[in-house]
């Protein structure tokens, strides 16, 4: 990476300078972060621990949960420290690392959501051949390709952004080191960077949304051919959750990055950015759990196992007390 900038660190201004409001926001985002970790890690443990969820659909879901947990962890802890500290400094390379990880996880999630839509199409269109069509030789490369695409996309923007000069200011009016607010404080010509951002985000969004739309068009045709109302209900329960997640995530990404720079508003975009980087990772486990019968049944099985284990331990303790002289 070619560092020609005069800045050796950046100051993340965050959401507010009001001390009382910062305490409230600290508690709010701490609760959101804890809930995000519990929800996503819990979903991963559930998928790994329940044999009935050992299929490609839930493998994708567990990977999505890991991406969401990492995405939130890349941004939230640093923001929490900023709320409680007078110094909101992040080093030059710390800022570059944060941007690289944020773009990696954000892009990976886009590709994963598209892969999950294709997986749903295969499962519903030809359920008898699902195990063959979506074998580990198919879905594991899809997961690897999603991560690879995210990493390549992140490298392009990280190198392009941090090759700029930041002699104008080192104050970033944002909650983390995102591309648009950094371009806003650069004293270099940013036309190429803006073009790269628009082109790559537009291309990735267009390709992944097209995959989702085509997959769900075929899914809809399959639903119309179904005679069983129970089968339709199950399809809607699994696909409804995914469609909700796709709509929320892709909608916010398009709003943030695919538009003219003249419409860029730091304050407004900071709120939207906070939602898709911190809010969505918290919402995804809720969306996929509440709308998915298999996940809810797996939760019940886990709870029953825990209750049975506790009951057996109690019986053993009672028996040992009985045997004691």
From Swiss-Prot:
GO terms for cellular component: membrane; plasma membrane. Gene3D superfamilies: Rhodopsin 7-helix transmembrane proteins. It comes from the Eukaryota. Keywords: Cell membrane, Disulfide bond, G-protein coupled receptor, Glycoprotein, Membrane, Olfaction, Receptor, Sensory transduction, Transducer, Transmembrane, Transmembrane helix. It is found in: Cell membrane. Residues 1-22, 65-97, 161-194, 256-269 are extracellular. GO terms for biological process: G protein-coupled receptor signaling pathway; sensory perception of smell. It is a multi-pass membrane protein. Glycans are attached at residue 3. The chain crosses the membrane at residues 23-43, 44-64, 98-118, 140-160, 195-215, 235-255, 270-290. InterPro entries: GPCR_Rhodpsn (IPR000276), GPCR_Rhodpsn_7TM (IPR017452), Olfact_rcpt (IPR000725). Belongs to the G-protein coupled receptor 1 family. This is Olfactory receptor 5T18.
């Amino acid at each position: 990476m070619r560092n020609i900038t005069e800045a050796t660190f950046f100051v993340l201004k965050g959401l507010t300078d009001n001390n009382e409001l910062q305490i409230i926001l600290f508690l709010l985002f701490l609760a959101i972060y804890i809930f995000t970790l519990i929800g996503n890690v819990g979903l991963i443990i559930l998928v790994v621990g329940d044999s009935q969820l050992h299929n490609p659909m839930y493998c994708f879901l567990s990977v999505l949960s890991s991406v969401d947990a990492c995405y939130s962890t890349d941004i939230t802890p640093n923001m929490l420290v900023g709320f409680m500290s007078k110094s909101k400094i992040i080093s030059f390379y710390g800022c570059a690392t944060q941007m690289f990880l944020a773009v990696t996880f954000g892009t990976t999630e886009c590709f994963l959501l598209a892969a999950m839509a294709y997986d749903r199409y295969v499962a519903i269109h030809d359920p008898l051949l699902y195990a063959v069509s979506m074998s580990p030789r198919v879905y594991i490369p899809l997961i690897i390709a999603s991560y690879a695409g995210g990493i390549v996309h992140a490298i392009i923007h990280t190198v392009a952004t941090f090759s700029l000069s930041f002699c104008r200011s080192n104050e970033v009016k944002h909650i983390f080191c995102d591309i648009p607010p950094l371009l806003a404080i650069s004293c270099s010509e940013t036309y190429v960077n803006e073009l790269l951002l628009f082109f790559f985000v537009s291309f990735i969004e267009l390709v992944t949304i097209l995959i989702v739309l085509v997959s769900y068009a075929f899914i809809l045709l399959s639903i119309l051919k179904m005679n069983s109302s129970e089968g339709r209900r199950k399809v809607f329960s699994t696909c409804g959750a995914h469609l909700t997640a796709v709509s929320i995530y892709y909608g916010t990404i398009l709003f943030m990055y695919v538009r003219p720079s003249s419409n860029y508003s730091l304050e407004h975009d900071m709120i939207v950015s906070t939602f898709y980087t911190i809010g969505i990772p918290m919402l995804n486990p809720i969306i996929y759990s509440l709308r998915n019968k298999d996940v809810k049944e797996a939760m019940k099985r886990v709870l029953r196992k825990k209750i049975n284990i506790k009951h057996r331990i109690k019986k053993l303790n009672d028996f040992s007390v009985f045997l004691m002289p």
